[in-house]
Amino acid sequence: MAANLSRNGPALQEAYVRVVTEKSPTDWALFTYEGNSNDIRVAGTGEGGLEEMVEELNSGKVMYAFCRVKDPNSGLPKFVLINWTGEGVNDVRKGACASHVSTMASFLKGAHVTINARAEEDVEPECIMEKVAKASGANYSFHKESGRFQDVGPQAPVGSVYQKTNAVSEIKRVGKDSFWAKAEKEEENRRLEEKRRAEEAQRQLEQERRERELREAARREQRYQEQGGEASPQRTWEQQQEVVSRNRNEQESAVHPREIFKQKERAMSTTSISSPQPGKLRSPFLQKQLTQPETHFGREPAAAISRPRADLPAEEPAPSTPPCLVQAEEEAVYEEPPEQETFYEQPPLVQQQGAGSEHIDHHIQGQGLSGQGLCARALYDYQAADDTEISFDPENLITGIEVIDEGWWRGYGPDGHFGMFPANYVELIE
């Protein structure tokens, strides 16, 4: 708990004021606690100085002393605060009163020296005055006036400070000054000369560099003219960028699966001896279905027989077959077909024939698919990326399929165009 200064406040304040008043004979005041409480009370005051105050200290109590003494150096009044903790005070009380020191220091303001004492050796008057002397600042001594006016007797005349001029020393001094002035001037000239030479060397280097660049530019221009074309640095840079872009495109295209299939197809076309390009497959039975549906069943086997030969154009021909017969057969099978869109785009023409016609159409379609090689039905929509691929919609039929790779096949699309398509976009028809 904090120290209580309000209970005995007037008495405490009165004792403090009597000590700090310079004309008051009271020069010390002693404060302590009331029993084991935290209430501060006045233990005593006196006019006998430090010797009298020391005798009032009790070794079994916690006490606070505030004294007025004279500075031995300046003779000015100084105030000393002594925090006394007797040797007989128990540890619990010491711990409780340790926080009251700052409270008492705030109440007893103006102390020049603060002493924490526990034994009589710490509060001896000589020891206290020594600390006061050290706290007053520098250890100086004040001169005391022995007399305002003193007759010290006649004073001797003031001596002259005139010195005769020495010509030799003067000449030496002047010569020395001129020597240093000349040295400074020479140093300044040397620095200016070095600066001028550096600037001249820099200008010469710049001139040589410009001349060298002009000569190199002239040689390049002459070399370009000799090669038969005028080139500029911008054009050279553009050509380099074109080469880099072309190389990058070639590398990217070499990695793309579609380009791999294109290369395989070109290799197959160059190695084959006489493999004609597959043309658009003409469906004889479709044309005759639209014109003569009643006679279609009689001529369908011929178309079914000739279709497998069209689906395998790369088979090696028989050695005994002359080229003219092969050409004749190809012309018989590969005619310039009309657009096959009518087979898928115009189903109403067939539906107008009635229920009997629909049965005939399904039968004809089954016979046609059986003669067109491997067939598949589209599951998803796919749009061709270039002219080497085919486009189709869901439920479209793809005929004449060639399995050239695990992921990409080739076949005839709904429009009769032959090209590649992704294998996972279709399902095979058994």
Curated annotation (Swiss-Prot):
Keyword Oxidoreductase: no
Domain annotation ADF-H: ranges: 4-133
Biased composition (Basic and acidic residues): 245-267
Topology class, membrane: Peripheral membrane protein
Annotated site residue numbers, Cleavage: D361, H362
SUPFAM superfamilies: Actin depolymerizing proteins, SH3-domain
One biological process term in Gene Ontology: synapse assembly
Regions of compositional bias (Polar residues) in chain numbering: 233-244, 268-277
Molecular function in Gene Ontology: actin binding; actin filament binding; cadherin binding; enzyme activator activity; protein domain specific binding; structural constituent of postsynaptic actin cytoskeleton
Post-translational modification: Degraded by caspases during apoptosis.
Cited InterPro entries: ADF-H, ADF-H/Gelsolin-like_dom_sf, Drebrin-like_SH3, SH3-like_dom_sf, SH3_domain
Keywords: Acetylation, Actin-binding, Adaptive immunity, Cell junction, Cell membrane, Cell projection, Coiled coil, Cytoplasm, Cytoplasmic vesicle, Cytoskeleton, Endocytosis, Endosome, Golgi apparatus, Immunity, Membrane, Phosphoprotein, SH3 domain, Synapse, Transport
Region entry Disordered, spans: 219-283
Domain of life: Eukaryota
Residue ranges of domain SH3 in the record: 371-430
Coiled coil: 176-231
Modified residues (N6-acetyllysine): K176, K288
Its biological purpose: Adapter protein that binds F-actin and DNM1, and thereby plays a role in receptor-mediated endocytosis. Plays a role in the reorganization of the actin cytoskeleton, formation of cell projections, such as neurites, in neuron morphogenesis and synapse formation via its interaction with WASL and COBL. Does not bind G-actin and promote actin polymerization by itself. Required for the formation of organized podosome rosettes. May act as a common effector of antigen receptor-signaling pathways in leukocytes.
Entries under PANTHER family matching the protein: CORTACTIN AND DREBRIN (PTHR10829), DREBRIN-LIKE PROTEIN (PTHR10829:SF12)
Domain notes: The SH3 domain mediates interaction with SHANK2, SHANK3 and PRAM1.
Subunit structure: Interacts with SHANK2, SHANK3 and SYN1. Interacts with FGD1 and DNM1. Interacts with ANKRD54. Interacts with COBL. Interacts with WASL and WIPF1. Interacts with MAP4K1 and PRAM1.
Family: Belongs to the ABP1 family.
Name of the protein: Drebrin-like protein
Organismal lineage: Eukaryota, Metazoa, Chordata, Craniata, Vertebrata
Gene name of this polypeptide: DBNL
